């Protein structure tokens, strides 16, 4: 059964879209990532114009992150205070990212910068996560005790001034690194057209040492706010939000996210981190392969502006 | 039956108002408006044409080339080159006001119908359509062998929006022809131009044009116009709908 998408201006199979929503929703609920870095390329593959894909995915991400945030809020796993501090940096970062996006597009190298950023970010984060979680699993397998966090063992950047206590996350750290992380996520998110959850979760876990589940829950809350802002921004500036596409995706996505959230809680934290690390690494490799392999056609055609 | 009725009617029309001075044509489309609704997956339109043979001394047109052009858009064609192991866009060419949809339907392969010069002048055949490029500060069409031009045609053909069918025009009687114009589901919305040219012994004889419209209606149109005219409202409504769906799913699946 096909459905015509009024803004994307093409017919697609409704079941393909639903399945896509459920699969990506499952992953986003499980790992607390928005899923944009998976969904956007898949939609473009289906023939949806990139501008419409990026804008419409934000509606799907808003819906599934809201659903996930509610679940985590009820389980009291969201660190609202940490989320708000991250947001102050995040919103400034988004603005800087939008400006960088415009400058790079003017010089015609936006695609390349996006691809290289993807490869570097995903490759680094994926490798770090996989290595760390494998070490943790190995320790457990050998029956060794995990390192207990000692209060005095904070790295230098957490010992900077303006310290703040985040009770939910059980950390007492300087706000400077928190705001900086928020800024970086906002910047990369705007530049790469993603929610940034898959970068934020490891950053919270490894840099700020927030417990895994709290990191996931707080990242979901952040995704919710940034994606709701993104819907409005895209709708007003580009008119590229396809409500029909978004609705089908979000119905599948929210259902998938519910199961994903449960699956995420059923798994031990180390295994969850290993899986997310592998996923991030796989997407990074995929982008790298695309850039290195000789393309089928050395020429590509894009529609100028017109915001179609 | 409707397919037969149309050419018969046209024949009557031609006989009634015959002007023998030049070979005239009467054209008719099975519908002049393609409407896009939620189950739209593409459509086909049938074009009927009747050629008035004119005075017996004149050669009867032997060939027909139908060209359908969708609304114009500007495109950029990029060329990639390997740089430090990565494929990078190194060069680009702007195609200004190129048709977003281009169908060439002919009674036989265009190169058999007339000389390359004539075809080029008449813009008959996929390779002979004028595609204006911006080269530096100049605007011009280039030779058909230009790699950017060929790449542009190749990509558009792969997208199913450009095509040439050498057997797309069929004569159902000596002076009556029929052409089927496929409109794919991804066809852009807007005004389309149908140009029919007839040839006899390699020279153009007559030409006729029709217009065709592809438009969204009902729900599709409502959504598209709302997004255009009330972007704030549309954005807010979409955002609220998203939150609503998220909330409902959360409540529906609540277990604790």
Predicted regions and their residues:
Chain B
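Short solvent-exposed capping/turn motifs at the termini of beta-strands
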Residues: 51-54
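A short tyrosine-centered beta-strand micro-motif
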Residues: 190-196
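Sec/Tat signal peptide C-region and signal peptidase I cleavage site
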Residues: 18-22
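Bacterial N-terminal signal peptides
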Residues: 7-16
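Juxtamembrane interface at the cytosolic side of transmembrane helices
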Residues: 235, 242-256
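Short, aromatic-rich amphipathic segments at membrane interfaces
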Residues: 182, 205-235
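N-terminal edge beta-strand
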Residues: 23-39
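Membrane-proximal low-complexity regions enriched in glycine and acidic/polar residues
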Residues: 82-188
